[in-house]
A protein has these predicted regions:
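Short beta-strand segments at enzyme active-site cores
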Residues: 21-29, 33, 128
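Short catalytic helix/loop segments, enriched in acidic residues and glycine
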Residues: 1-10
């Protein structure tokens, strides 16, 4: 899931670092005792049985290819959105950020929720179509859904409701001509 987006994310990180953009990583984690899982435990069994997204266990860390540098923020979140229950909005506002670029996984959950909340909070949103990814959905009573379809539909919804959906090349081109430091990669 998502490894094919690493090269684009690496290009984006290199550009953001060189341009002085604020880079913020968000990690979806839950407490070991499960006290913050809420409905996640009801709808997704890997969370319910503590097999994934548990703070301190392998699998929640940023992959080595995209490791944050010392000066880059890493925010742990307990819901899909990087804004919900975190200080992300305050951090961005204090840095006079007005645009958020969204990358990562999963397109339809964490990335989509973060993009929506960014827009709801008054930010311009760039959603990077080739730097976001997802996985195949099993049949939950509605038929299995391939990752490509989940991704395509989510991008279509975002494009007409929430964000400027673009690929890495377009983002780099547009960002090269705008003022550096006004955008945050999340």
């Amino acid at each position: 899931m998502g490894r094919d987006i690493y090269p684009n994310m690496q290009r984006l990180l290199a550009f953001a670092r060189q341009s002085g953009m604020k880079i913020v990583y968000t990690l979806h984690t839950h407490r070991e005792d499960g006290s913050d899982m809420g409905m996640f435990a009801e709808v997704w069994s890997p969370i319910a049985n503590g097999a994934c997204l548990v703070d301190g266990l392998p699998g929640i860390d940023v992959v080595p290819e995209l490791t944050p540098q010392e000066n880059e923020l890493v925010i742990k979140k307990h819901r899909y959105s990087g804004f919900f229950g975190t200080d992300l909005d305050m951090i961005l506002r204090s840095a006079n950020i007005n645009t958020v670029a969204v990358t990562g996984v999963t397109t339809e959950n964490c990335c989509h929720s973060t993009a929506r909340d960014a827009m709801f909070n008054g930010y311009r949103v760039a959603f990077l179509s080739d730097a976001t990814g997802t996985f195949d959905y099993p049949d939950a009573g509605f038929g299995a859904i391939p990752a490509s379809e989940v991704h395509r539909v989510t991008l279509g919804i975002l494009a007409v409701s929430t964000a400027h959906v673009m690929d890495t090349e377009e983002f780099l081109r547009l960002s090269s001509t705008s003022r550096a430091g006004q955008c945050s990669a999340a």
